Amino acid sequence: VSKFANFTEGDVQLMDMTEYAEPYREYVVESRLGLFSREGKLYGCPTHVGATVAFYNTELLDGVGIDYTTIKTWDDFKEAGSKYHEETGKSFGNLDTSTNMFFNLLVAELGSDYVDSDGNLSVNNQGIVDAIQLMKDLQDANAVSLMPGGNTDADEGFAAYANGDFAAMIM
């Protein structure tokens, strides 16, 4: 997806799929189609819209008396993470540094984006500022720390979870 824009520059070498997608538009998340559109034409159709989920290692959490079912907000997550760190010296959750999955989740949750409605770069808008602040607050509270290897899909990330270095994963 991140490379798709490269294929829509200049003389587009892709087939316009607008008419083929039209009967299905009501069943597709419209914002996903925007990723594959240029000048009103659709050049690709997404086949996946990922959901965000939280995974908790209940064995680790039970050991320190944290009930993951009570975590409903980022404040709850921060409180549980601080308690977990106090009890174990380990991190509750993580922040990735290579994929920005967590950051992008927060930006979207806050109703923001990297560009404004006119397509202009907007990296200092309030949603982005608030997402960065929330990540900083979580880290300052010892609720999260940086993921070894930069992300959960790296060998170091796999090992960190297998070793019990983190009790929660948001993805």
Spans of features found by a protein language model:
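Hydrophobic residues within well-ordered alpha-helices
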Residues: 77, 84, 107, 158-164, ...
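Hinge/lid segment of periplasmic solute-binding proteins
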Residues: 2-52, 62, 75-78, 86, ...
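Glycine-centered hinge/linker elements that transmit conformational signals in sensory
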Residues: 80-82, 120-150
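Bilobed periplasmic-binding protein-like "clamshell/Venus-flytrap" ligand-binding domains
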Residues: 43-44, 85-97, 142-145
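Alpha-to-beta junction loops
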Residues: 1, 12-13, 90, 163-171
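Short, solvent-exposed loop/beta-turn-alpha elements that line the ligand-binding surface or hinge
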Residues: 18-30, 70, 87, 112-132
